[in-house]
Structures are given as structure tokens and as C-alpha cells.
Design a protein with these regions (language model features):
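The serine-hydrolase catalytic nucleophile loop
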Residues: 1-12, 26, 215
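Alpha/beta-hydrolase-fold enzymes
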Residues: 80-163
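Conserved alpha/beta-hydrolase "acid-adjacent" motif
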Residues: 210-216
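Catalytic histidine-centered segment of alpha/beta-hydrolase-like enzymes
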Residues: 234-248
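Conserved alpha/beta-hydrolase
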Residues: 11-34
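Alpha/beta-hydrolase active-site loop
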Residues: 6, 39-60
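Alpha/beta-hydrolase fold nucleophile elbow
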Residues: 60-73
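Short beta-strand/loop motif that positions the catalytic acidic residue
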Residues: 197, 203-205
Length: 272
């Protein structure tokens, strides 16, 4: 899993249930290297997931079929594509995932004022052109209220602070992204690869999600050969808020069905 704030809420519970957890930051973000900072490149981020899989596969306590992926929002979309390319995975959990940028675009546009859309487009184009000239990224907030120039201004976009960092523990958390992402999201459709996912898939869908929408996630899950859909009441960040206990308990139960725990691997080796 990635190390965005509040993912530790799930990581601790998974670890308490007997599962080892490997968490990392995508390049250009958090504690990972890479410049310029705060730049999202979908292919590079998927390559980071692949590197994490390759690293985990070489650890002594990871047996065959001992790797599961967990991703939220954009990372939730990444894990679908990565799982499609890695048929040997044990399972994958996609929580409130970005499944189909084309399907999400009209909803995101409706959440913006015309002036905000114009300003965002101008900033995104300027950022993309500037990158060709080696200029620093033009950053925008990852979330904002309607009328703001931000990556997302849907009604539940601003729930992120309350959900992910309510106590302001993550003082170094950068809530910005290079504006060029606004030109890229509509073409990012990782859910189209769901039919190639051979491992069990748990799709966690928030029924009132106004950011990634439940419909595309359910449709992608139906295309996957071995999928389950967990419906939660609430908006995009509900798995970190009012639906947290329901989400984490269901995810642990799913992992227990499909993923060999680290302590079981150690015990099995001790009996040889």
C-alpha cells in the first residue's frame, strides 16, 4: 500500500491480524525521491507498484501467492492495472478507486464553476508547456471548494482533511499536485483491464461517493473473473470515517480467505 495519511489505520489492523505490510511513497511524493516534486505520472507510479511487488517477493517471509495489493482512490485504480499485469498475486483490494477517468470527467466538470474551469485549464496547459522547458511545476491544491482552482472540487473532496489527518499529525503532508494532471485524468481508465485480473478482487464502493462514483467501480468489478463488491454507506472517504470499522473488518476477512499470513509461512517453514 502507499503511505498517504490514514492508510496506517488499515496497515495497523492488517498487521494485528497477522499480515506483514509493505508501505511506500510514489516517486516525486512523500519520503521517496524524484524531481520535480508533486508530479503525477501514471506509468511511473504503476512502475513503483511493480518495484514494491518485486521487492516483497524476495523477502524471506513471503511465500507463493503471498502478496496482496491495497489501494485507495487514484492508487486504487493503479492496483487494478498492476494486478492485471501480475497474475500470480494472491488478491487485490481497490477502495473508492479511480476506475474510469472518462466516466468521472462530466461529474468533476459539473462540480466546477465556469471561471474555475477556465483558470484550471489555463494553469494545466501552462504547467504542461513549462515542463517541456524544464520549468518548476505549477501546483494546485488536491481538493477545494466549488469555485476554487483545485484538482477536485466535488462535494466530498474537502472531506479529506477530516478523514486522513484530523489531528494534523502529518505536518509535512503536501496537499498539492502539478496542475497538468487536469489534462490527464480523463484518459486514465485502469478499470478497462479488470477482465484480465486473475486473482480475487475486493472492490470497496461508497454508495454516495461523488468523487470517483460507485457506478464505474461496480461495472469494473463485474468484468473481473473473481470479484466481490463491498457497498458502504457514505461518501468518498467513508472507509476512513463512519464506515471504517465495516471496511477494515471486511478487508481482513477477505485477506484471510486469499492471502497466506506471514506467521503461517514462518510456522510452515519451521516444520520442514
Amino acid at each position: 500500500m502507499t503511505k498517504e495519511p490514514a492508510s496506517d489505520l488499515f496497515a495497523r489492523r492488517f498487521n494485528d491480524a497477522g499480515f506483514a505490510v509493505l508501505a511506500f511513497d510514489h516517486r516525486h511524493f512523500g519520503e521517496s525521491g524524484g524531481t520535480p516534486r508533486q508530479v503525477v505520472r501514471f506509468g511511473e507510479q504503476r512502475a513503483d507498484w511493480q518495484a514494491a511487488i518485486d521487492f516483497a517477493a524476495g523477502l524471506p517471509d513471503v511465500g507463493p501467492g503471498g502478496i496482496s495489493l491495497w489501494g485507495f482512490s487514484l492508487a486504487g485504480g493503479h492496483v487494478l492495472r498492476v494486478a492485471a499485469d501480475n497474475p500470480g498475486l494472491a488478491s487485490v483490494i481497490a477502495q473508492s478507486p479511480v476506475v474510469d477517468g472518462r466516466a468521472l470527467a462530466p461529474n468533476a466538470l459539473r462540480a466546477m464553476t465556469p471561471l474555475a474551469l477556465l483558470r484550471l485549464t489555463g494553469r494545466a496547459v501552462a504547467d504542461a508547456l513549462g515542463s517541456l522547458l524544464g520549468r518548476p511545476p505549477l501546483l494546485i491544491p488536491t481538493a477545494g471548494v466549488r469555485g476554487a482552482v483545485a484538482s477536485l472540487t466535488t462535494p466530498d473532496a474537502m472531506d479529506g482533511d477530516r478523514a486522513l489527518d484530523p489531528d494534523h499529525r502529518y505536518t509535512d503532508w503536501e496537499q498539492t499536485v502539478a496542475a497538468r494532471i487536469a489534462l490527464q485524468m480523463g484518459g486514465y481508465r485502469p478499470g478497462l483491464h479488470a477482465s484480465r485480473i486473475r486473482c480475487p478482487l475486493l472492490m470497496v464502493v461508497c454508495d454516495q461517493d461523488r468523487s470517483t462514483l460507485p457506478g464505474p467501480s461496480v461495472a469494473a468489478a463485474r468484468r473481473a473473473p473473481a470479484s466481490e463488491v463491498l457497498h458502504l454507506e457514505g461518501r468518498h472517504y467513508a472507509p476512513f470515517l463512519e464506515a471504517h470499522e465495516e471496511a477494515v473488518e471486511a478487508e481482513i476477512a477477505f485477506l484471510r480467505k486469499h492471502l497466506v499470513r506471514a506467521d503461517v509461512v514462518r510456522e510452515g517453514r519451521g516444520r520442514r
